[in-house]
A protein has these predicted regions:
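Membrane-embedded alpha-helical hairpins and interfacial helices in multi-pass inner-membrane proteins
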Residues: 50-55, 93-102, 121-197
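Hydrophobic alpha-helical transmembrane segments
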Residues: 31-36, 63, 67, 78-82, ...
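Alpha-helical transmembrane segments of multi-pass membrane proteins
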Residues: 62, 66, 105-112, 176, ...
Length: 197
């Protein structure tokens, strides 16, 4: 079995054993793009001036993680999404580590994983792009709510459904609209530039 270039694959060697073949250029490209998306996740929240209320409305960290999942695939999206809020909290003190950065780590990891996995499984059309994007956005918010509920239980506090609804949907409406408008436009541009499939 021959390996297709551009991504790690399981290949059948002589004797029936399997091995993994990796294209060094593809790995380097993925690392560079992952670092770029991670840097954007650090920088974009600065446009809100570290004002939590504005950040909650615009959700600036969501953009590079969703893009990372689409461009690089689910595993990269998961890794960059999980790392970004935790490292940013350590470096800049924002978002606060507990419970916000921790819950965001799981939320963004879900965004990156689901968007990447779905995009690899569907036809690369604009309707399927929207379907993958919306599914990832819903999955990430559900994961965020579940983690916040667990963390609240660990500290003896409460996280009612009204708090979930406010944080996941009502407060974030401007960011949700911006994601639905801008991310497909960016992805189509990246497709035309041959940066992604």
């Amino acid at each position: 079995m021959a390996c297709k270039p551009g991504r790690p694959l399981f290949c059948l060697a002589k004797g029936g054993s399997f091995f993994i073949k990796t294209n060094p250029r593809s790995t380097t490209r993925s690392l560079v793009l992952a670092a770029l998306f991670l840097a954007l996740a650090f920088v974009l929240p600065m446009i809100t001036g570290h004002v939590p209320q504005v950040g909650n409305m615009l959700c600036p960290m969501h953009f590079p993680i969703l893009l990372c999942g689409f461009v690089l695939g689910g595993p990269w999206g998961l890794a960059v999404g999980f790392i970004a809020p935790l490292v940013r909290s350590v470096l800049f003190g924002m978002p606060p580590m507990f419970p916000i950065a921790i819950s965001m780590a799981f939320e963004l990891a879900a965004y990156g994983l689901v968007s990447g996995v779905l995009w690899r499984k569907v036809k690369h059309t604009v309707p399927m792009m929207y379907a993958s994007l919306v599914t990832a956005m819903v999955a990430g918010r559900l994961v965020w709510g579940a983690v916040r509920f667990v963390l609240a239980g660990l500290t003896g506090s409460s996280f009612p459904f009204s708090a979930f609804l406010s944080g996941a949907l009502l407060t974030a409406v401007p960011g949700i609209v911006a994601q639905l408008v801008l991310i497909p436009l960016i992805l189509v541009a990246l497709q035309k530039a041959k940066v992604m499939d």
